[in-house]
Amino acid sequence: MTYIENIFLCMASPLLVAALCMGRRQLRFFLFCIAGMGVCLLSAYINTFLAAVCQADALAATAEIAPVVEEMMKLLPLVFYLLVFEPEGDKIKPAAITIALSFATFENVCYLIQNGADRFSFIFFRGFGTGAMHVLCGLIVGGGLAYTWQRTWLKIAGTCGLLGAAITLHAIYNLLIAHGGAAQYVSYALPVLLVAAGKLSALRLTRRE
């Protein structure tokens, strides 16, 4: 049995100490890191509870329950940040990415502790694939919210649409992982390629401007 709350305490404690020492400018980054790991912890409990209540098998829990729960949980601290602090548009995407990458980091650490780290190639691909998938979902949601929350009439509909897009991407990723075989490695490579393609496109647009 893996006591993930103990893992959370061990990982969050240094971040909290660093947040107190680094000053107000860097405080937001560390708080978003802790929030990302915290919602990952809560997502694990909620996934387990819903899987038990719905009597879902492993495939249903992975492809149907987990994407919805995890993407909604990642959205909660971001929506709180938007409602309470009303940040400028250029601060929304970094916040979403920070939450996503800390979520992925905590998830990978828990996976390593539970399943071992003896298969380097598999862990290597999983680390990059899972991290890129969560960051890609964060880019979709964060980049979209930076646009929609500047327009009052788009806030609710835009947020729901972006959440749906992130859930769909997450579900496809998990479904390919659950299928196993070559599809599993395709799913690990796909988010990395999409992030790389998006970055290259952004660089080209910047050079043209």
Predicted regions and their residues:
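Hydrophobic alpha-helical segments at protein termini of multi-pass membrane proteins
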Residues: M1-E209
